[in-house]
């Protein structure tokens, strides 16, 4: 600012020896504030304005820039601290963290539903349980055994995801009616994404099986691949799920035969390098899971009867009705539990006898009690009971290693 121009009367008031300032009249002019020379040009000055006598507070606001019209809001740039002295996360940081984790969480949730976790858990438990049948003493539980078991479980889970993913790819329209929350049916995954996922998991399964070098393991993966593909893919002479009998046979072959025999032989012959033998517990596991696999094959279509009827899938539930198929499934399972109790009672091992008899009796009682209270007109109740059947499936694989 080059100059500050004041009125002569004010300059006189500032002179030494000046007596006193005359009182300001209400119609007095405010002095021009300033004039600024910029680059040698004409000075720019604020013009004087007429006022009706500003008050002291108004002058203070004017000269001190305290007017609310000129106040610049202050926003803290650093994060504050709470009473304990710990820094609090700013809202911007919280928003950034949320924006990062939300898509990751959504992707994981979609893949979780795509993988059909109840089948993944069943596959893992069955392989671990059957592999333990090859263990003869505690020294067999070695790093070699654990490595062979892990290789088998991972390869089988990859193949499991391929099979359930392929089924969803060819059932998109049906699942929009029966299972609208699945990612392909809901539109979260595009068909191209589904193709990429099932192709990747099939390749990883075969790649791991080939790298391990176990003939029983690779054979189990290959047969599961063939049956799973034929079950779902919509090509001439395939899509075996359209036939209730053939669909049940596919599930029975994988769940009851391949899982029990192939993975037992993988541990017995490839890991332990022992001759192939079919023990009493292995025969029991195969026979019991034959019943259980038939039940799963029949029961899984009960909640899906609406979509199956629309798209021409001739399941037993469509042909016979939900109620009749439901009680057939319950009867088959109760029969299997009775056989298991009788077999446990004939065991020469005392602890095995008690464990198998009491365990299967408890499961049979729970099944009967639950089946009597179900509302067969409610799809939600039927779906919940189907998941209960899978829990019984898991429990059986906890009992199988105790059979001796």
From Swiss-Prot:
- Which intervals of the chain are annotated as region Disordered? 68-96
Biological processes per GO annotation: vitamin E biosynthetic process
Q: Which reaction does it catalyse?
A: phytyl diphosphate + homogentisate + H(+) = 2-methyl-6-phytyl-1,4-benzene-1,4-diol + CO2 + diphosphate
Its localization reads:
Plastid, Chloroplast thylakoid membrane
Q: Which GO terms describe its molecular function?
A: homogentisate phytyltransferase activity
Tell me the protein family, please.
Belongs to the UbiA prenyltransferase family.
Transmembrane intervals: 119-139, 144-164, 184-204, 216-238, 245-265, 282-302, 325-345, 348-368, 382-402
**Superkingdom of the source species:** Eukaryota
- Pathway stated in the Swiss-Prot or TrEMBL entry: Cofactor biosynthesis; tocopherol biosynthesis
EC number of the protein:
2.5.1.115
Q: Which GO cellular component terms, listed alphabetically, does the Swiss-Prot or TrEMBL entry include?
A: chloroplast thylakoid membrane
- The transit peptide segment here is 1-77
Name it: Probable homogentisate phytyltransferase 1, chloroplastic
Record InterPro entries:
AtHST-like, UbiA_prenyltransferase, UbiA_sf
**Spans of biased composition, class Polar residues?**
76-92
Give UniProt keywords alphabetically: Chloroplast, Membrane, Plastid, Thylakoid, Transferase, Transit peptide, Transmembrane, Transmembrane helix
Name the membrane topology term. Multi-pass membrane protein
Summarize the protein's role.
Involved in the synthesis of tocopherol (vitamin E). Catalyzes the condensation of homogentisate and phytyl diphosphate to form dimethylphytylhydroquinone.
């Amino acid at each position: 600012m080059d100059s500050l121009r004041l009125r002569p009367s004010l300059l006189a008031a500032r002179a030494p020896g000046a007596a006193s300032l005359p009182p300001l009249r209400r119609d007095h002019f405010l002095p021009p504030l300033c004039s600024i020379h910029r680059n040698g040009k004409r000075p720019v000055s604020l013009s004087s304005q007429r006022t009706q006598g500003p008050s002291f507070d108004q002058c203070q606001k004017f000269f001190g820039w305290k007017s609310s019209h000129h106040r610049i809001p202050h926003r803290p740039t650093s994060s504050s601290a709470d009473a304990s002295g710990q820094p609090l996360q700013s809202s911007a940081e919280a928003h950034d963290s949320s924006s990062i984790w939300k898509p990751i969480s959504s992707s994981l949730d979609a893949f979780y539903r795509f993988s059909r976790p109840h089948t993944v858990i069943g596959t893992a438990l069955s392989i671990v349980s059957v592999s333990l049948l090859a263990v003869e003493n505690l020294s067999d539980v070695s790093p070699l055994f654990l490595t062979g078991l892990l290789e088998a479980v991972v390869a089988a889970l990859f193949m499991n995801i391929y099979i359930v993913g392929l089924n969803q790819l060819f059932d998109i329209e049906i699942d929009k009616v029966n299972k609208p929350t699945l990612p392909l049916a809901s539109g979260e995954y595009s068909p191209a994404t589904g193709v990429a996922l099932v192709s990747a998991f099939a390749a990883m399964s075969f790649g791991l099986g080939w790298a391990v070098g176990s003939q029983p393991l690779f054979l189990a993966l290959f047969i599961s691949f063939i049956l799973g593909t034929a079950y779902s893919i919509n090509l001439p002479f395939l899509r075996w799920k359209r036939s209730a009998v053939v669909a049940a046979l596919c599930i029975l072959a994988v769940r009851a035969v391949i899982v029990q025999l192939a993975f037992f032989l993988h541990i017995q012959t490839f890991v332990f390098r022992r001759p192939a033998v079919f023990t009493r517990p292995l025969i029991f596991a195969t026979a019991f899971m034959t019943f259980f696999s038939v039940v799963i094959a029949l029961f899984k279509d009960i909640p899906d009867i609406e979509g199956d009827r629309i798209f021409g899938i001739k399941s037993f539930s469509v042909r016979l009705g939900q109620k009749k198929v439901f009680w057939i499934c319950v009867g088959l399972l109760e029969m299997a539990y009775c056989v298991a109790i009788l077999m446990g009672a004939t065991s020469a091992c005392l602890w095995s006898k008690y464990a198998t008899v009491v365990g299967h009796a408890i499961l049979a009682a729970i099944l009967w009690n639950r089946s009597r209270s179900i509302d067969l007109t409610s799809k939600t109740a039927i779906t919940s009971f189907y998941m209960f059947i899978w829990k019984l499936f898991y429990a059986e694989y906890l009992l199988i290693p105790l059979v001796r």
